């Protein structure tokens, strides 16, 4: 398995393309100049395209991915109804979902043969919309509205329209600020990192009565932390055994172990990392974690070690200015 790491640096308007080898070392293979401040990125389900959101002219750009080395070639673009904060796709590669924090909306862009061709639906009134996360069954879109302390739930129709479910939302505690999400591989649990109180909520997708319920909330910060809380990103290993969340004020990544059924998180430790870690990701082997420092302008590669999933630094690399997003593609 070959792996390519993409790093988005909006201040220098670049994507750095790296080869990740089996020992966790990175080799720079390409630097792409992007026509705009590039922020969120996602790889298409078939691994043929990288979709990126740019501003100040709000667009989604599609780059064709070379199957041999992961190099990028521009392919298409499509306008968006707000500044792109987060970008994702459905599991079949039919739609791109874009959450916009500033516009307070989530949009759906239709894909034709992998290329974006236009917005088919927009839902407004989502104050602080920070991500759009498709459920494992490809039917429910979870959309955290950070400023409203709620996660809105939509059914995605066959033509890409979003229909509010019943119930239409789940709520966090007041002042939590739900931000980014991941799902357990067993498809029974979701995990949401809350920006404003730096916590992680565990959501059971279906209890015996068919409801969605928050079954655990854990603080991601050390006990003696008294500064402003400013959590950012969350990721889980492919085997579902280890979960990671980061905070930008403390510049740390918190390590959690996950119970076998996915219902319980246990805090295992803290890893100091790059200054202001806005984004990170886990590779497809589950052996390495790559974190980007928005203020250090560097990325660090860590090996995931032992039963606890603790992080051991393997190397640091210079990238563009203000790196914000990390994506790993296996090909």
UniProtKB/Swiss-Prot annotation:
Pathway: Carbohydrate degradation; pentose phosphate pathway; D-ribulose 5-phosphate from D-glucose 6-phosphate (oxidative stage): step 2/3. One of its GO terms (biological process) is pentose-phosphate shunt, oxidative branch. Keywords: Acetylation, Carbohydrate metabolism, Glucose metabolism, Hydrolase. The modification N6-acetyllysine is found at residue 287. The keyword Cytoplasm does not apply. InterPro entries: 6-phosphogluconolactonase_YbhE, Cycloisomerase_2, Lactonase_7-beta_prop, N2O_reductase_N, WD40/YVTN_repeat-like_dom_sf. It catalyses: 6-phospho-D-glucono-1,5-lactone + H2O = 6-phospho-D-gluconate + H(+). Pfam families: Lactonase. Its EC number is 3.1.1.31. GO terms for molecular function: 6-phosphogluconolactonase activity. One of its GO terms (cellular component) is cytosol. Catalyzes the hydrolysis of 6-phosphogluconolactone to 6-phosphogluconate. Belongs to the cycloisomerase 2 family. HAMAP family: 6P_gluconolactonase. This is 6-phosphogluconolactonase. It comes from Shigella boydii serotype 18 (strain CDC 3083-94 / BS512). The lineage of its organism: Bacteria, Pseudomonadati, Pseudomonadota, Gammaproteobacteria, Enterobacterales.
């Amino acid at each position: 398995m070959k792996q390519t790491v993409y790093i988005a640096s909006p201040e220098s308007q670049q994507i750095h393309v790296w080869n990740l080898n089996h020992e966790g070392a990175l080799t720079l293979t390409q630097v792409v100049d992007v026509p705009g401040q590039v922020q969120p990125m996602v790889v298409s389900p078939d691994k043929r395209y990288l979709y990126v959101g740019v501003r100040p002219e709000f667009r989604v750009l599609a780059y064709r991915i070379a199957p041999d080395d992961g190099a990028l070639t521009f392919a298409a673009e499509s306008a968006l109804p707000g500044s792109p904060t987060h970008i994702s796709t459905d599991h079949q590669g039919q739609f791109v979902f874009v959450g916009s924090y500033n516009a307070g909306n989530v949009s759906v862009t239709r894909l034709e043969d992998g290329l974006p061709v236009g917005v088919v639906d927009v839902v407004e009134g989502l104050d602080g919309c920070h991500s759009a996360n498709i459920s494992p069954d490809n039917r429910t879109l979870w959309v955290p509205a950070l400023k409203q302390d709620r996660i809105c739930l939509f059914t995605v129709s066959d033509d890409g329209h979003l229909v509010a479910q019943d119930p239409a939302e789940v709520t966090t505690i007041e002042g939590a600020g739900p931000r980014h999400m991941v799902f357990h591989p067993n498809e029974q649990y979701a995990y949401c990192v809350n920006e404003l109180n730096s916590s992680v909520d565990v959501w059971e997708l279906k209890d015996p009565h068919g409801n969605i319920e928050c079954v655990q909330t854990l603080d991601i910060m050390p006990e003696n932390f008294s500064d402003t809380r400013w959590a950012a990103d969350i990721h889980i290993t492919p085997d579902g055994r280890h979960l990671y969340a980061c905070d930008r004020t403390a510049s740390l990544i918190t390590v959690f172990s996950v119970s076998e059924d996915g219902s319980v998180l246990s805090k295992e430790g803290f890893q100091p990392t790059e200054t202001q870690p806005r984004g990170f990701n886990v590779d497809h082997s589950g052996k390495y974690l790559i974190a980007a420092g928005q203020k250090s302008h560097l990325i660090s590669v860590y090996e995931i070690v032992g039963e606890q999933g603790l992080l051991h630094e393997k190397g640091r690399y210079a990238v563009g200015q203000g790196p914000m997003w990390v994506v790993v593609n296996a090909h």
